[in-house]
Amino acid sequence: MLLQKFSEGMTNKDLQLLDSLLHEEMLFLQDTILETKEQWVKDMEIQFEKGTFDASKIDVITKFETKEMGALEIIIKEGDTLLRLSSVFLYKDDKIYRQLVKYSS
């Protein structure tokens, strides 16, 4: 389903695939950050180009997925520190409509 394709797109740094999964009205929300689809894609492009996104340091666990929504738990290894985040996805027209992210350590 969508989460598997999303994970593949992130792991392979495939912006074309990621963009195709996002609804035209997609919004990304993380704490006080709000990005449109265009802003999110541009931000990921910068992270991929600069090497600040490293899939080898990330473990992704699919918590659940239905036709309307899904959730991932993502664990990022930074040296001796583990950063854990929850990412909830809401779907519309079989695309990612909203992504809500909450970090915790």
Report each predicted region and the residues it spans.
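Absolute protein N-terminus
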Residues: M1-L2, S105
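A beta-strand edge to alpha-helix "cap/lid" segment located at domain peripheries
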Residues: F28-L29, E35, V41-S105
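Amphipathic alpha-helical repeat scaffolds
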Residues: Q4-E8
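Residue-level detector of alpha-helix boundaries and kinks
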Residues: L2-L3, E25, L29
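Conserved short acidic donor-positioning loop in nucleotide-sugar-dependent glycosyltransferases
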Residues: M10-K13, T32
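Short, well-ordered alpha-helical segments enriched in acidic and aromatic residues
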Residues: N12-E25
